[in-house]
Amino acid sequence: MSQNQETRGFQSEVKQLLQLMIHSLYSNKEIFLRELISNASDAADKLRFKALSNPALYEGDGDLRVRVSFDADKGTITISDNGIGMTREQVIDHLGTIAKSGTKEFLTALGQDQAKNSQLIGQFGVGFYSAFIVADKVTVKTRAAGEEADKAVLWESAGEGEYSVADIEKKSRGTDVILHLREDEKEFLNEWRLREIIGKYSDHIGLPVEMLTKEYDDEGKECGEKWEKINKSDALWTRSKNDVSDEEYKAFYKHLSHDFVDPVTWAHNKVEGNQAYTSLLYVPAKAPWDLFNREHKHGLKLYVQRVFIMDDAEQFIPNYLRFMRGLIDSNDLPLNVSREILQDNKITAALRKALTKRSLQMLEKLAKDDAEKYLQFWKEFGLVLKEGPAEDFANKETVAKLLRFASTHNDGSEQTVSLEDYILRMKEGQKAIYYITADSYVAAKNSPHLELFNKKGIEVLLLSDRIDEWMLSYLTEFDGKQLQSITKADLDLGDLADKESETQKQQDEAFGSFIERVKNLLGERVKTVRLTHNLTDTPAVVSTDNDQMTTQMAKLFAAAGQPVPEVKYTFELNPEHHLVKKVADIADETEFADWVELLLEQAMLAERGSLENPAAFIKRINKLLG
C-alpha cells in the first residue's frame, strides 16, 4: 500500500527532451535496454564503493546482478537490480530533473534534422528517459541500501507533463524499472529479442545480466523457471586484448560513454612494474555538445583493483585532452581514494604523465595511418588540441606535430597542413615558419601582408581560430624553426629578402619629405611612418613591433573583458603605388590630410576588420570621390 503520495510536474527541460527523444531516437529504440542496464551497472558500482567503508550496506546480499524479465499478458518488461537504490529525495532529483548545466542551450541546438538530433541526444546521455521511447508508462520501485523496508519509493509517469511519487514497502534493496510497453512495441516481449539486445550492448559489462528462463524435464515438458546469466559479465579491460574483438571494444565504449557513434580509435594497455595499472582509452568520433562549457564533466572512470571508485576523474588527463574517454584500473591507489587525495598524489602524477603520453601516441598513430580519419577528428577536436602548447610544456613538440592549419599552399579553408608538411616545402634559405592571424580565413587569405610572400612563392599559414594567437604566444618554434608573424613591422626574411636596389634608394630619398609630412600630420596616433617595398597591389598597411600586442591578441583580451593596452601601429606606405605617388604631390594641406587619413583608415580596416569611426571614413570617401 502506497503512502504520502504526491504528483509533481517535470522540469520544463525534461518535457522538451522526452518529446524530442521519442521522435529522434525511434529508429534506434532498442537502446532503452542498454541504457537501463548501464544504470543498473552504475548502481552496483556505487554500492561496492560505499560498502568498502560500510559492509552492512550489502544486507547479506553481496552477489550483485541485474535481472531482465517480461510479462507478455501484462505487456511489461522489468529491469531489476540489487545495487545502491534511491531515497525519495534522490528519486525526485534524478528522475524529475536533468541535473546538467547548459541543458537549455543543448535543447536550443536541436533542430529538425532527426539524424543529427539522434546523435546530439546520444551525446547528451538520455539514460533513464530512454524508457519512454517504447513505454507509455514507466513505474519505478526503489529502496536505498541501508534504509528500512518501509522507506522504499514508488515513482510513476506517462512521460508527459507530470509524475507521481509515493512511499511503499520493498523488502529487497535496489531498483525495479517496469516498462508498460506501447501497443506497437510488443516485439520486445520476446525472450530471444531481449537476449539479442543484451548480447549486442551489454555482454561486456562487469555485472551479471540474468533472464528468467523456462526449465524443461527430460521429456521436454516445462517444469519450472530459473534465472540464467546471459552475458560474459567479466570486466572487459581485465581480459587480454587479443581476446577482445573490435565489436566488443566498440560496444564497451558505448556503454561507458552512452554515445551512439563508434569511436575513431582505442588503446588497451596493461602495465606492470613500479606502476601497475590497466588503461582503456578511446578517441570519440564526435565532439560532445558542451565541450567548451566550463562545467563540462570530463575525465576517466577510475577503478582501484577492479572496484569502481568514481566517474569523471579529470586528474588523469590534461584539459586539452578532455575529449578522451575510457577508464583506468590502478593497483597502487588506496581503495578509499578521494578527489582531494588524487589532486596532490605522486601516483596520480605518474599515471597522468603516462596516460597523456599514451593518448598523444594514439593520435600520432591515427594521423600517420589514416590521414582522412585524423582530419575528421581534427574538425571535431582541433580547437581543444590547440590548448596543448600552453598547457603542456613537456609535450609541446608532440602536440605541435598534431596541429593542422590552412595555408596558401592549398586553395580551401580546410585545416590540413601540418608543421612538418610546411617545413618539407620551405624555400632554400628560408629559416622561419611564416603565418598570419585574422578574424576569418577570407580575411587572412586576402591580407595585403601576403603580397610579397605570394610574389616570392613562400608558403604562409592562414590562422583564423580565436585561440590561434594565444596558442602562438606559447608555440614560438618548431623543429628549430621560429614561427614568425608576417604582420610584424620588423619582419626579417633573411636570405629570402630582396637586396636593396638603386631604385629603392632613390625612392627613399625622393619620398623623405613626404614621410615627414605624414609623421607630422599623424603625430602620436602611430608609432612611426615609413616606406615599405613588401607590397605590390596595396598602397599602405599597418603593422606592429615584435614587443607589441598583436591585433588579434588585443581582440581576444577585449572579448574576455580584460584591459587592453593601446596598440600603436607602424604606418607603411608603398612608393610604387599610384595613390601614394599622387598624395605625395598634393600641396594643399587640407586635401593632403584627407588622403593620408583615407590611406590610414584603409590600412586599419584591412588589419582590424573594423574602424572606430566608420561614419567619418564613409564621409571622407564621399568627399574625395565628389
Curated annotation (Swiss-Prot):
Compartment(s): Cytoplasm
Residue ranges, annotated region (A): 1-339
UniProt-annotated stretches for the region B: 340-555
Family stated for the protein in its record: Belongs to the heat shock protein 90 family.
Functional summary from the UniProt entry: Molecular chaperone. Has ATPase activity.
InterPro entries: HATPase_C_sf, Heat_shock_protein_90_CS, HSP90_C, Hsp90_fam, Hsp90_N, Ribosomal_Su5_D2-typ_SF
C: annotated segments: 556-626
Signal peptide bounds: none
GO BP terms in the entry: DNA damage response; protein folding; response to heat
Name this polypeptide is given: Chaperone protein HtpG
CDD domains (alphabetical): HATPase_Hsp90-like
Any GO MF annotation of the entry: ATP binding
Domain of life according to the entry: Bacteria
Keyword terms: ATP-binding, Chaperone, Cytoplasm, Nucleotide-binding, Stress response
Gene Ontology CC terms, in alphabetical order: cytosol
Subunit structure and binding partners: Homodimer.
KW ATP-binding (keyword) present: yes
The keyword Nucleotide-binding is assigned to this record: yes
Pfam families, alphabetized: HATPase_c_3, HSP90
